[in-house]
Regions:
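Short, acidic loop-to-helix structural element flanking the phosphoryl-transfer center
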Residues: 80, 84-114, 155
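Short histidine/acidic/glycine/proline-rich micro-motifs that form metal-
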Residues: 15-18, 51, 88-92, 121-122, ...
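Active-site neighborhood of HAD-like aspartate-dependent phosphohydrolases
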Residues: 2-46, 187
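A metal-dependent, Asp-based hydrolase signature
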Residues: 52-85
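Short, surface-exposed acidic
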Residues: 33-46, 73-86, 169, 210-211
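Asp-based, Mg2+/Mn2+-dependent phosphohydrolase catalytic module
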Residues: 1-12, 117, 121-122, 126-211
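Alpha-helical elements of Rossmann-like donor-binding domains used by nucleotide-donor carbohydrate transfer enzymes
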Residues: 26-27, 50, 63, 67, ...
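Hydrophobic alpha-helical core bundles mediating ligand binding, dimerization, or RNAP-core interactions
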Residues: 25-28, 48, 65-69, 86-90, ...
Length: 211
């Protein structure tokens, strides 16, 4: 089946899509000086996600981890602690899941341009841009929330993607694991798929004639 919609560029989210590994609050707790009890690990995890949106919008590493530490009743982390925290948090972005890599490879082989549209702190974005996988598979725009100061599902970040793509919305496809982010893309006439797993998305792409 041919791609009757003439898709030219496919944008992917990263976390929860290409990279399934999640941050490890147990490791964060250890670095900032808490024990590995369930209570402490849960406290750190809640603090991390309470400030994540602001971090994704461009908050500095120090500001973010100071906010997390403060929520845990701790003083500002040292420069060394911040470095370790950032490394622990961002290191998972060095590689994508193997099945996701095969999907990107197949799409590139089929002639599609691939881009990224993701909520992500600046340090993580740097890791992605310098990664082997991004240099190998991503030949379209890479839109990071921290670079534009806007997070999904705000329509502004999708407009940034449209401007960078230099294509009409009907030439694009967006894939994300969050239904509200998929809906936000569709409101701007960008076709979008909800990522449940790589096999399901492959089937969706086959139905669209893309694979």
């Amino acid at each position: 089946m041919a791609d009757e919609l003439n898709t030219e560029l496919i944008f992917f989210d990263v976390g929860g899509v290409l990279v399934s590994q999640r941050p490890d609050p147990r490791e964060f707790a250890s670095i900032i000086g808490l024990d590995d009890s369930a209570e402490c690990v849960s406290l750190v995890d809640r603090a991390v996600w309470a400030h994540r949106d602001t971090y994704d919008e461009g908050m500095s590493d120090l500001e973010f981890w100071d906010s997390v530490a403060g929520d845990c009743g701790l003083p500002q982390p040292s420069e060394d602690q911040v470095h370790k925290l950032v490394t622990a948090d961002a290191s998972r972005m060095h590689a994508i899941d193997e099945a996701a890599a095969h999907l990107l490879s197949d799409l590139r082989s089929a002639g599609y341009h691939l881009g990224l549209l993701t909520n992500m702190p600046a340090t993580h974005a740097s890791v992605v841009m310098e990664s082997v996988w991004a240099q190998r598979y991503i030949n379209g725009p890479m839109i990071f929330s921290s670079h534009v100061g806007i997070t999904k599902p705000n329509r502004g970040i999708y407009r940034e993607a449209l401007a960078s793509a230099q294509r009409e919305p009907d030439k694009l496809l967006y894939i994300d694991d969050r239904s509200e982010y998929v809906k936000a893309a569709e409101y701007l006439d960008i076709r979008a798929l909800t990522w449940e797993n790589v096999d399901a998305v492959r089937e969706d792409l086959k139905k669209l004639g893309i694979l």
